[in-house]
């Protein structure tokens, strides 16, 4: 075992890859895919965590998405393919490729792919909490 593996902290998000000392490049095409929010979302894809940031390349199948939830960390969503419809603190938006969506910490929000096509997005969160959020109670 290398000293890098021994010095590598555990990921906060189950199944995510944790960057360790001397690791600078990650091929998201080969990183294990995880659920973006197992209790409330269909988003899935590879996720890598550093000391202060978490990144993920997520996909939601056409017409599927996330139920209302929140998380104590803020989030950015960069739409790469498809259309991402979201409601953030009661305001509904529609983000197309090239759009960046900001979700403040603790904001109740949901998001989904339109029925016409899958949505693919690159997401970034601060690593204070992990990738997964808290489903809003019914």
Predicted regions and their residues:
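Ligand-binding loop in jelly-roll beta-barrel domains
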Residues: 105-131
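Short beta-strand His + acidic residue motifs that chelate non-heme Fe in jelly-roll/DSBH
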Residues: 66-68, 86-87, 103, 109-115
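A short, N-terminal "cap"/entry segment at the start of jelly-roll beta-barrel domains
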Residues: 1-52, 136-138
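Short, conserved beta-strand element in jelly-roll/cupin
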Residues: 59-60, 71-86, 124
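Structural motif
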Residues: 76, 83-85, 92, 108, ...
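Well-ordered beta-strand scaffold positions
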Residues: 53, 58, 91-93
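Short acidic-glycine-tyrosine-enriched beta hairpin
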Residues: 91-105
